[in-house]
């Protein structure tokens, strides 16, 4: 990768390890410190529109959204100014933090940014019976568990494809999760914008509010924290969409696709040259097999958070 535009390195670029399939590095030059992300094309499940995303990031940064300054972007490499901050624990965030996340979302949705590419939604995967057979034939450690959940995953796919999504549609981050946030002086900083694009407002609010309001699993959801995100959104001038399952369908849809993707990867003859190692992929499969049926089974409880 050519990084000459960042200046003369003061020391070798260092790898920053994490669970992402992309590779993140820190580069220190006489012009400052930069986060250099090498995108992994083998794990890309949707088209990455580098120009649209970069233009959106520039507008967000110029408006004062707390985020790393975007420096450059290509379909292969993203560069941002390095920012310091604390990673969030896997637990509900403080109410004031959640409130500010809601405010940030409202400010993002108020940006007037042209998005030049149409959003195309693919049908949810329905080959779960075939995957269960392949998993058993290839001796996957979770084969029996997948087989026991085939009907559930088919029901989830049907829900994803038939759930009404009344809108409105906004251009937004689409992935404000605890692992894409830093806490700096107790306030949120939003990272990892590459999935940005058009999305139904309810889906963005629901996935964001739920993710910052809970710990591992779904037994520790704090309704006050969930509501704080929505209160912050309204306080900043946002208008809440109607209540309903559409608030959670995007989160379920994304998790379903991610689980399917990782199941296929586990059974591939050759591992891709980059991305998550096989052990981590197996872990993500188990997370989906355990968590998705639970979340789907609690949809009515989750909708209760909106009342």
Regions found by a protein language model. Give the residues of each.
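Juxta-kinase regulatory segment immediately upstream of eukaryotic protein kinase catalytic domains
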Residues: 1-13
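Active-site acidic catalytic loop and adjacent metal/ATP-binding pocket
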Residues: 17-31, 35-36, 158-203, 214-216
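ATP-binding pocket architecture of kinase catalytic cores
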Residues: 28-117
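A glycine-centered beta->alpha junction motif in the catalytic cores
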Residues: 41-42, 79-91, 133-139, 256-275
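A cross-family kinase active-site recognition segment
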Residues: 91-146, 167-169, 198, 276-280
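ATP/Mg2+ or Mg2+-diphosphate-binding catalytic cores
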Residues: 136, 258-307
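Active-site activation/catalytic loop segments of kinase-like enzymes and analogous catalytic loops
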Residues: 203-238, 252-271
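All-alpha amphipathic helical-bundle segments outside canonical DNA-binding/catalytic cores
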Residues: 240-251
